[in-house]
């Protein structure tokens, strides 16, 4: 996923279907400098991770 699209998803009021390794996730924050996003699985909000944007897929 590119940085611009990830930022659009974060700013959107609508929930978008995004996955990380096949797991549905929520994007909390996009770091443009490092090309990463802070995410968590929808079913485990306490499990935050910092991942590369190119590992995220929009369904």
Swiss-Prot record:
Family according to the record: Belongs to the SspH family.
NCBIfam families for the chain: PRK03174.1 (NF002867), SASP_H (TIGR02861)
Biological process, per Gene Ontology: asexual sporulation; sporulation resulting in formation of a cellular spore
Subcellular compartments: Spore core
InterPro entries registered for this protein in UniProt: SASP_SspH (IPR012610)
Keyword Transport: no
Gene induction: Expressed only in the forespore compartment of sporulating cells. Disappears after 45 minutes of spore germination. Expression is sigma G-dependent.
Source organism per UniProt: Bacillus subtilis (strain 168)
Name recorded for this polypeptide: Small, acid-soluble spore protein H
Lineage: Bacteria, Bacillati, Bacillota, Bacilli, Bacillales
Keywords per UniProt: Sporulation
Highest taxon in the source lineage: Bacteria
GO CC field: endospore-forming forespore
